[in-house]
Amino acid sequence: MDRETLAARIDHTVLGPTTTRADVLSVVDDAEAHGMNVCIPPCYVADARDHASADRTIATVIGFPHGTQATSVKVAAAEHAHADGADELDLVIPIGRLKGGDHEAVTAEIAAVNDATPLPVKVIIETPVLTDAEKHAACEAAADADAAMVKTATGFTDGGATVPDVSLMSEYLPVKASGGVGTYADAAAMFDAGAVRIGASSGVDIVASFAE
């Protein structure tokens, strides 16, 4: 893997509750300088799209960070993000429904959001709060709903991406590893486990720590 390929597999991320427009535009500038994608709050998608080059991939989040919104609200948010210029959607599943055993509802929600726009949907399953059986069920729901990827975590619960979780998830769909990936060594471990994308607020550091 060369530096350009690495950068193209990173979603440089800013999603904190105090994120400002200036923060988002700074992340876009970093992404432009290094060849990364960005993942940003939905309220700034239009600003980022206006600021970024036409070929810069902009992802945003739906149902973030806890996944507790009604499905109709998530569908509307997906449609709004698409209209504002988003290229990809990172969707948080209804975690409580999964843990309560209502797997059909989880699948139906993912499918509803997936069908609402032509954008690829990366399904955030929040691995730190799931048992292995629940991780399998969440990934199966995402696969059954024709999602594009599964993603480990939001970063809003304790824990993040782990090699065993990425390996498990990659049995079902391509994996975005997010949470605690701060260096190239971290990213390489995730890629070796089966991840195809990294989500990180430290995207610049990951690229900078790469040695060809």
Swiss-Prot record:
Protein name: Deoxyribose-phosphate aldolase
Cross-referenced Pfam families: DeoC
Protein's GO biological process: 2-deoxyribose 1-phosphate catabolic process; carbohydrate catabolic process; deoxyribonucleotide catabolic process
Functional description taken from the UniProt entry: Catalyzes a reversible aldol reaction between acetaldehyde and D-glyceraldehyde 3-phosphate to generate 2-deoxy-D-ribose 5-phosphate.
Family of this protein: Belongs to the DeoC/FbaB aldolase family. DeoC type 1 subfamily.
CDD domains in the record: DeoC
Catalytic activity: 2-deoxy-D-ribose 5-phosphate = D-glyceraldehyde 3-phosphate + acetaldehyde
Location relative to the cell: Cytoplasm
InterPro entries the UniProt entry points to: Aldolase_TIM, DeoC, DeoC/FbaB/LacD_aldolase, DeoC_typeI
Organism (species): Halobacterium salinarum (strain ATCC 700922 / JCM 11081 / NRC-1)
UniProt-listed Enzyme Commission number(s): 4.1.2.4
Keyword Lyase carried by entry: yes
Molecular function terms, GO-annotated: deoxyribose-phosphate aldolase activity
Entry keyword set: Cytoplasm, Lyase, Schiff base
Top-level taxonomic group: Archaea
